[in-house]
């Protein structure tokens, strides 16, 4: 009974955490930024309290095993701390928030270690939020809904197109991964297809070059993980080495040209 109750609490807190893009408490002036940040911090605080209490009362499950991926958040935090301009100290609150997000990463890793069943649920809920955001943005582009910025037509539930495009960019590879996992057409398949289709339609209108690059790189990586046979690829590379070299050179030229075009896009 205690385990079921704890699972329910984790499910509720995770659902509230993933609902952060739509959070609005109606009490803070800069509600589109501050309220979302405060919402994440509040839910993360409750999540850490529940997780620490669970480890204290039931230490048998232990801490989650570390992988090479777990080094990345700490590495990113270290890089940010080293490159931060302490002389002018422009945004100390962002340093605090980034540190909190690193702690949240390890909290979620511990939650998934204790209850792996939540991975599927949280993934599907995350994709659903991406689908809602994409539909929201499409309605704004068509003039059926107001944006949150007078200078931009497309913002979703965010303040400007930058974070909105970034949010869509992180939902796309997750949706693609779940889509490639499905052996039959079921609810996760159609939900992932809907998220990918609507996000691809809306994302170019955000004019976010970093989001476009992130989508291409991350989706290519996800596709390679699920569909690329390394041994077969190595065999083909040895058999058609010349053509792969030519293709690599042409691809590099196209990449440089595309990068230059993206750089000058907003000038």
Predicted regions mapped to residue ranges:
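Membrane-interface interhelical linkers
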Residues: 59-64, 252-255
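Short, hydrophobic transmembrane alpha-helix segments
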Residues: 23-37, 56-62, 88
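Short, Lys/Arg-rich, polar N-terminal cytosolic tail immediately upstream
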Residues: 1-4
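Active-site pocket-lining segment
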Residues: 114
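Polytopic alpha-helical membrane-helix bundles and their juxtamembrane interface segments
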Residues: 69-72
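Alpha-helical transmembrane segments of multi-pass inner-membrane proteins
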Residues: 6-23, 41-54, 74-107, 117-266
């Amino acid at each position: 009974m205690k385990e079921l109750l704890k699972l329910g609490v984790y499910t509720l807190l995770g659902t509230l955490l993933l609902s952060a893009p739509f959070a609005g408490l109606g009490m803070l002036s800069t509600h589109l930024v501050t309220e979302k940040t405060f919402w994440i911090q509040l839910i993360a605080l409750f999540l850490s309290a529940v997780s620490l209490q669970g480890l204290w009362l039931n230490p048998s499950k232990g801490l989650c095993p570390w992988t090479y991926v777990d080094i990345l958040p700490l590495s990113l935090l270290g890089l940010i701390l080293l490159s931060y301009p302490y002389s002018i100290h422009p945004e100390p609150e962002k340093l605090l928030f980034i540190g909190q997000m690193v702690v949240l990463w390890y909290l979620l890793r511990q939650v998934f270690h204790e209850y792996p069943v939540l991975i599927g649920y949280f993934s599907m809920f995350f994709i659903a939020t991406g689908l809602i955001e994409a539909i929201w943005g499409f309605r704004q582009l068509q003039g059926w809904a107001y944006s949150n910025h007078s200078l931009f037509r497309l913002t979703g539930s965010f303040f400007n197109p930058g974070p909105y495009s970034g949010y869509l960019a992180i939902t796309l590879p997750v949706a693609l991964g779940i889509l490639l996992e499905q052996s039959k057409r079921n609810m996760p398949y159609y939900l992932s297809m809907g998220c990918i289709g609507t996000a691809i339609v809306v994302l170019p209108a955000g004019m976010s070059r970093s989001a476009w690059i992130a989508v291409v790189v991350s989706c290519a990586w996800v596709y390679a993980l699920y569909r690329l046979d390394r041994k077969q690829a190595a065999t083909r590379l040895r058999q058609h080495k010349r053509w792969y070299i030519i293709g690599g050179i042409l691809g590099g030229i196209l990449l440089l040209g595309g990068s230059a075009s993206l750089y000058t896009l907003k000038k």
